[in-house]
Amino acid sequence: MIPDNTKFTNPFFGRILTAMVTPFTENGNVDYELAIKLSNYLFENGSDGIVLCGTTGESPTLSWAEQHDLFIAVKGSLDSSCKVIVGTGSNCTSEAVEATKKAYDSGADGALVVVPYYNKPPQEGLYKHFSSIANSAKDLPLMLYNIPGRTGCNLLPDTVKKLMDFSNILSIKAASGRIEEVTELRAICGSELSVYSGDDSLLLPMLSVGAVGVVSVASHLVGLQLKEMIQSFQSGKVANALAIHEKLQPLFKALFMTTNPIPIKAALELSGWNVGKPRSPLSPLSNDMKKQLSFILTSL
């Protein structure tokens, strides 16, 4: 059954969702044991939910079988109150439909469905693509994922509004880098659509114009601080929220000094989590960048 998502104060997926890295062994295989340990650590340190197999999880280099096995391992280990959302997007509609069906059948709490990349469909094509996905698993809550910098295609608010006719489309990860995106979505779609910042550095500004939370990379490292920032903002302690926002800005910037998830994997390694190197064609963080990152981590 699709939950009531109309309460701005209580978004179904929660407020801090960690876009979790996919750990790899030295041989480059998925390290399921470490994924279990990391996901539980994240839940215990501020995360309301875990997003698997998204951009940060290196979904383009994971097979569908690996993605399924990763979900089964993580979901089976976590407390039931922690939402587990699986990336099921593809630029092939039939593949996205099948992946979303499988996520639902396997017990996922939700699916993250990215705007189709490379083939650059028009808005009508995007509407039909997401309609097919929504119809394929009508009881699975969906989060749309708009990240035009990676996909080359922008999902417009008017199209999102049309898609809200499907009761399982509850939210959107807004990762265009534009604060105005939240304002536009709220104006057209209202409060029934939960808007999540897709950028840690824009979380506080986006909260101020109606976002409900964040799909975060930095929460691997500072989940409790992000939680305090959101709670401070909600309770009217804006000065404290701003102080946390400003303190964490160097980290937010460092985690995107090169392509995500290269820096966060290096940061986790520096913090004692041997999550392995990114899969090719991504490459490890350079030594110079790693020194910069290490300095920032020690200053937190």
UniProtKB/Swiss-Prot annotation:
It catalyses: L-aspartate 4-semialdehyde + pyruvate = (2S,4S)-4-hydroxy-2,3,4,5-tetrahydrodipicolinate + H2O + H(+). The active site is at Y145 (proton donor/acceptor), K173 (schiff-base intermediate with substrate). PROSITE patterns: DHDPS_1, DHDPS_2. Pathway: Amino-acid biosynthesis; L-lysine biosynthesis via DAP pathway; (S)-tetrahydrodipicolinate from L-aspartate: step 3/4. GO terms for biological process: diaminopimelate biosynthetic process; lysine biosynthetic process via diaminopimelate. Pfam families: DHDPS. Keywords: Amino-acid biosynthesis, Cytoplasm, Diaminopimelate biosynthesis, Lyase, Lysine biosynthesis, Schiff base. Pyruvate binds at T56, V215. Its main location: cytoplasm. It is found in: Cytoplasm. Homotetramer; dimer of dimers. NCBIfam families: dapA (TIGR00674). This is 4-hydroxy-tetrahydrodipicolinate synthase. It comes from Prochlorococcus marinus (strain MIT 9312).
